[in-house]
Each structure stands twice: as C-alpha cells, then as structure tokens.
Amino acid sequence: MTLSNTIQITPELIAAHGLKPDEYQRILDLIGREPSFTELGIFSAMWNEHCSYKSSKKWLRTLPTKGPRVIQGPGENAGVVDIDDGDCVVFKMESHNHPSYIEPYQGAATGVGGILRDVFTMGARPIAAMNALRFGEPDHPKTRHLVSGVVAGVGGYGNSFGVPTVGGEVEFDARYNGNILVNAFAAGLAKSNAIFLSEAKGVGLPVVYLGAKTGRDGVGGATMASAEFDESIEEKRPTVQVGDPFTEKCLLEACLELMQTGAVIAIQDMGAAGLTCSAVEMGAKGDLGIELDLDKVPVREEQMTAYEMMLSESQERMLMVLQPEKEAVAKAIFVKWGLDFAIVGKTTDDLRFRVIHQGEEVANLPIKDLGDQAPEYDRPWREADKRAALPANLVAAPEDYGQTLLSLVGSANQSSRRWVYEQYDTLIQGNSLQLPGGDAGVVRVEGHPTKALAFSSDVTPRYVEADPFEGGKQAVAECWRNITATGAEPLAATDNLNFGNPEKPEIMGQLVGAIKGIGEACRALDFPIVSGNVSLYNETNGVGILPTPTIAGVGLLPDWQAMARIGSASEGDRIIMIGVDGSHLGSSIYLRDILGSTDGPAPEVDLFAERRNGDFVRSAIRNGQVTACHDISSGGLGLALAEMAMASGKGLNIDLGECKGLSHALLFGEDQARYVIAVPADVADFVCINAESAGVPFRRLGTVEGDALAIDGLLSVSVQQLRQAHESWFPAFMDGSALAAAE
C-alpha cells in the first residue's frame, strides 16, 4: 500500500517533528513504506513525551495506584475516588507550561479549560479548581508580564465557566526565568455508578464529533510541549490554543444531559494532539480500529489540510462513540446548546487508524502502535550527589529576630497571594467553606448535609533539587499534612511531574528519585496516585527548571462543622506544637532568603512520624478539641506562628523554654511532620495527655493573647506589622514599586 505524498519527507522534516532517526526507522519498519505527511504528523503527536510518556512510563508503573476507595486509577481522563453514599470525586492535575510562556493569557486559560474537560468527560460536574504557578525571579524583565497574563487567563476562564478556585501555589525562582510552570487542577462530583470511560466498544458504531469547530490554533501543540525552548520561541505563538469558556460551559451541560440518556458508549475530550489522540486512544483501548472522514469535521477556517485537521488543538471539543439508535436524541441536545454534532467516522474490527480527506486515504496506520504500544525508553540516569550535613551551629543566627521574621513574611515567596486569588471567583456555586490562604481549600458536597472535600497542592522544588528522593516524599507528605490540618481524611492524589531534559542522566536521575520518593510516601500514607501528567524538556537554552513534582490531593470531611481553620483561634486558647523541635536549616528559606545560601540537604521525611502525628491531629480536630490548626513547612515554626496570628488577627505569647536547641533552628528549622494547634484552655492538659499516650511528641508553646506575636524575649512584632509586611509585597511588585524600591 502506498499513499500519495505531496511533501517530501526529509531528515530535516523528521527532526522538526521531534522524531529521532531510530524512531523514524521504527515507523518504516512498522508500516513497510514511507509515511505520508499526515501520517508523519500523527506519529509525531502520538510518540512525543506529552502523549506517550515514553521516558517516564517505566517509572510511573512503580507508583501505588490502588486502594479501597479507588474506582478508577491512571489511564483515563481523570482519577475517580469513592466518597461514600454512592458519590465519587473525579480529579486530575495537568500542565500547560510551554503555551503559557509563549502566550500567557491563552496558555493559562486553555490549561484550565483542558483540565475541566478531563473531569466532565468522566460524567462529573466540576466543583473546584486549583493552580500551581511558578515564575522566574521577580526582577526578570518578563516576569510581571507573565504573572499578569497567566493570572488573568486562569481567572478569565475559570470565573466565566463557573468553577471556584479554592487553592494553589505561586513561587518565584530564577530557574523558571525561561520556562514557567502552569499546573492546573480540577475536581468534580459524580455518581459512582455513572462514570464514563474512553474505551470504545462495538464494531460499526458511529464516532461523533461534539462541541466547537476546528481551526488552525494549536496545530503542533503537543509536539511543542515535548521540546526545549530556544531563541525562536516567539515563532511558536501560533501553536497556542485559544479558549472560549462560554462554549465550554455549554459543552459541559450538553455532555451531562446526553449522559443521562444512555447514548454514550465511550467519550474522550480532544486535548493534546486533538482529533488524532482522542480517536487513537478510544480505539486502541477498546482493541478496535477507527475510520475518520475529515470532510465531515466541522471547521471554522477554509482549505484546512488533513494534517492541520488531525493535529489542531482547537478547544472545547469532544469525540464520542454513540449508540446508533440514540443519534437523533443526542443531536437534538447539542443543537439546543448551540454546539456542533457531526458523525465523522466509525469503529472497525481491523485495528487500523484510517483517515479519509476529500475522498482520498491520507493515513492508514496500526492503531495499537500509535497508542499503548508506542516506544518506551529506559533512559540512563545518575543519582544526585548527597549534600553534606549542615549543623545548625554552623548557620549564622539573625541579629534581629523580629526584622528577620518581617523579611520572611514579606518576601517574594512567603508573602500573601491575595493579589492573585482575589482575581479568581472563589465562592461561585456557593459551596466554598475554606478559601485560598489557608492549608487547604474546602468545598461542601452539594446535596449532603455534612460532607465536604478538602484540596491541597504542594511541592518544595529546592528540596527536590537537593535530594530528589526526600523531596518527592516531602511533596506527598506536605499535601497529606495540609489536608489533615482541616480535619479531613486524605483519600488520594494526582501528580504533575515537571522536569528538564530526560536525555541528560542527571535530569533523568531527578525524575527517577522523585518518583521513588513519591511512591514510598504514598504507600506509607495510604495516599494512592490516581491520575497525573508528566511535563519534560522544561529547559531554555540548556538551562533546566528546578525539578518540580507537584502533588495535588483530595480529602474527605464527614462533618464540615468539625473542621479546623488556620485563623479560628480564640482569646485564651493554648498553643501546642505537635512534632519535634526545629533543628534542620539545610535548604531552608531562612538560609536562602536571609543568608543568601542554598546549601545543605533537604529535611528527611519520617513517614511513620508523619502518619502518627497527622492521625493524632485529625482525631483531635474531629473530637472538637482544636480551634485552629496549621502545618509547619517553609519558614518553620516562626512563619507558621506568624501566619496563624495574621489569619486570626490575634496575638500569640510564645515561650520556647521547654524546647531544646538553638533559637534560630527552633524558629526557622524546617523539620517535617509538624503542626501548630490552638486548643481551649480547659482541654489543653487532656490533649497533651492523649499525645503522650499516643507517643506523639509535643510542646506547650503559649497562649493566644494581645495584639503581637511575642516569642520568648527574641522578638515582639505586632500583628498589624506582620500583616503590613505580608500583604504589601505582591501589589507593590505588580505595580512596579517593589522593583523601583529595590533599585
């Protein structure tokens, strides 16, 4: 069989499609001929890192993905976890890094749109969103432009679609100067017996195109997302998709309405690689072939080629395998919502992916080799060198503890993110119980009197760089801890693994180490990974990002009225630290932001202590013994106390007399498995007795009183001063005054 080729397939063209010479040879061996230009594009899209996970698949298989509550693990559009009463939560996190650097508004907006589609494709109504954003250093000339565009894009799409943004992260570091990260998370609610999957079943059934029309936007987007950046980056702007949240809202309602009719056999959103990836995945999963007739595809631009139509990443589109007898019902629903509905193909029994355009066959390929049998690499990797220990007595103590604390709470990475989250609608749908700014976002489960879900997103990239294994463990542990700090039971997680070029053994070593750490922590904490995304080649001119394996998790609150908040302490409450005294200053923000050093190892994560301490805190919260709770993470005990004081507006009188160690390590050490809790005075003794009997280390620290954070003669800073420092950096940065002052 030979397909006509109007474009010569040259080594340069092959390389431009991101295919290595040995991969192209594999294509020749598979199909026994030269591929057509359209086929080359299809292979390029399906065999790149973004779609095939060819560098990471071996290691992803080692992650724990099952558990008593897991209904659907990795391999579908999103993970599904049981939350009792016949309900389930559907969630996933995914990156849109490269597009957001090139075109920040549309890149971020379509990142939100794509993750929302992943959720409602499964039959779930989205109820919460988060985003983890990482930008270059604040004084880099592009950073403010990128922050402004990304935040506007996230808010513009999410707000218009109608989903509350309940949490996330914003971090600045020079290593993201040329390659920002935009990791978008969404969660939705569905009935456990009404989950829709992408696996096609049945021969000769109609393949239906749903949603918006196809244009040229995003052609080659998946291939771009699997490449490094260089000076030609601006030329890649046409590969960024354009989103329309109002069309997506109509698509959501039409899909959920259609799903009630029994018409849907399989459904897949069109994301990376568009029509190509969705059709191949549906067929390959079901051991079926797919035939597409591109003349039936709704288009919004004239004279589109087969190549452009197959690789377009136009947004707000779905592909579905339909019960034939339900065609009229299905079409009526989509017409009602003002959306396209077109039968563009059929399922076949020959395991071929066949594409017809203008009456000619432009692609005829083995579907399994495009999908789940794509190339897989066992890349060489090198373990990171262990950093030398950094005892606290070798780290300089601050001359002025109060000024040091003010500097930390007002720094680029620890200051309030209010400027960001106030641009997001956090209250739409009317179920938000905890908003951004605390440990986790909390959303009430619609239709249930007491049940709620908690959401958190976490990673500490400087730890992962220092020690990928411990950093991977810590990302999971902090997510688990933040969910626990509300009183919720952590159920499951999704991972978004952002790394540099995996062809470099040291970068591949970071990825391998982090996955090993994530796996160990997930197993120890019964916190399985049920969905996720890998984003590699995050490099510009050979400079890689900080390794950033973001972990987003979901927890269940059986009764949200027994929930803890960071800022709900009452006057006279006693402050207790759960966990060991601070001692670890290696890779800390005190070391980085105050002393200008990145030395030292990451803190070790004792997963047994993490589990024991967290279970104790959760139990105390659910028993009504805790009025406020906050996890201790970056900045140590000092920053955690400051954040609690700012959130409540009340002072804290703290005595470190019982603590053992150097004052700066006690305050700023970033030892793990720790919380600060506020408890009523009349139950403080009871809580401490319970902790002692459970083998949980604790320290009585002081009392909620006054209007200042006063620590043991070391510092006394008014809550007003703390808030002023905490709230002022971001607005000043965005209006330019912070940079002007720094100059």
Curated annotation (Swiss-Prot):
Keyword flag NADP: no
Single Gene Ontology MF annotation: magnesium ion binding
Positions annotated to bind Mg(2+) 1: 94, 533
Enzyme Commission designation: 6.3.5.3
Associated pathway: Purine metabolism; IMP biosynthesis via de novo pathway; 5-amino-1-(5-phospho-D-ribosyl)imidazole from N(2)-formyl-N(1)-(5-phospho-D-ribosyl)glycinamide: step 1/2
Catalytic residue list: 50, 96 (proton acceptor)
Binding site for substrate: 95-98, 117, 241, 313-315, 535
Chief location bin: cytoplasm
GO cellular component: a single term: cytoplasm
Residues that bind Mg(2+) 2: 118, 269
Gene3D superfamilies listed in its UniProt record: PurM-like C-terminal domain, PurM-like, N-terminal domain
Keywords: ATP-binding, Cytoplasm, Ligase, Magnesium, Metal-binding, Nucleotide-binding, Purine biosynthesis
Enzyme kind, highest EC tier: ligase
Gene Ontology biological process terms from the UniProt entry: 'de novo' IMP biosynthetic process
Subcellular location: Cytoplasm
Catalytic activity: N(2)-formyl-N(1)-(5-phospho-beta-D-ribosyl)glycinamide + L-glutamine + ATP + H2O = 2-formamido-N(1)-(5-O-phospho-beta-D-ribosyl)acetamidine + L-glutamate + ADP + phosphate + H(+)
Pfam families found in the cross-reference section: AIRS, AIRS_C, FGAR-AT_linker
Protein family: Belongs to the FGAMS family.
Function description: Part of the phosphoribosylformylglycinamidine synthase complex involved in the purines biosynthetic pathway. Catalyzes the ATP-dependent conversion of formylglycinamide ribonucleotide (FGAR) and glutamine to yield formylglycinamidine ribonucleotide (FGAM) and glutamate. The FGAM synthase complex is composed of three subunits. PurQ produces an ammonia molecule by converting glutamine to glutamate. PurL transfers the ammonia molecule to FGAR to form FGAM in an ATP-dependent manner.
Subunit (UniProt): Monomer. Part of the FGAM synthase complex composed of 1 PurL, 1 PurQ and 2 PurS subunits.
Record-given protein name: Phosphoribosylformylglycinamidine synthase subunit PurL
